[in-house]
From Swiss-Prot:
High-level lineage: Eukaryota, Metazoa, Chordata, Craniata, Vertebrata
Name listed for the protein in its UniProt record: Securin
Extent of Polar residues compositional bias: 110-121
Assembly behavior: Interacts with the caspase-like ESPL1, and prevents its protease activity probably by covering its active site. Interacts with p53/TP53 and blocks its activity probably by blocking its binding to DNA. Interacts with the Ku 70 kDa subunit of ds-DNA kinase. Interacts with PTTG1IP. Interacts with RPS10 and DNAJA1.
Broad class of the protein's primary localization: cytoplasm
Modified residues (Phosphoserine): S97
Record's keyword annotation contains Phosphoprotein: yes
Maturation and modification: Phosphorylated by CDK1 during mitosis. Phosphorylated in vitro by ds-DNA kinase.
Keywords associated with the record: Cell cycle, Cell division, Chromosome partition, Cytoplasm, DNA damage, DNA repair, Mitosis, Nucleus, Phosphoprotein, Proto-oncogene, Repeat, SH3-binding, Ubl conjugation
Residue spans of biased composition, Pro residues class: 95-105
Family to which the UniProt record says this protein belongs: Belongs to the securin family.
Region entry Disordered, spans: 1-24, 93-121
Sequence motif SH3-binding, location on chain: 95-105
The encoding gene: PTTG1
Naturally occurring in which organism (per UniProt): Sus scrofa
InterPro entries for this protein: Securin_separation_inhibitor
Amino acid sequence: RATEKSVKTNGPLKQKQTTFSAKKVTEKTVKAKSSVPASDDNYPEIEKFFPFNPLDFESFDLPEEHQIAHLPLNGVPLMVLREERELEQLLHLGPPSPLNMPSPPWESDVLQSPSSILSTL
């Protein structure tokens, strides 16, 4: 019976202690919230220092004068350049001419006989 009495007396005391500590916690959070300074009022010049527009960094479109959607590009092969040197050679070729054009490596010589073509494969 002594254990029953101690349990009965300890039960309400524990409840009072938990509510008391909960009040302390809420008081601490209220104090913490009131002590935080408002960021907009104290530092307005910082936001003007670095102008930032996130839309500037998310635009992947070409300007209107460089749009290529209206061009018929069906059948145009994709050019994959292995080195920067090949790109520089393409840029410095000038206007295309059938006499000066080097033959692409994927085209075979038209004058070759079929047997020589098969032997190279």
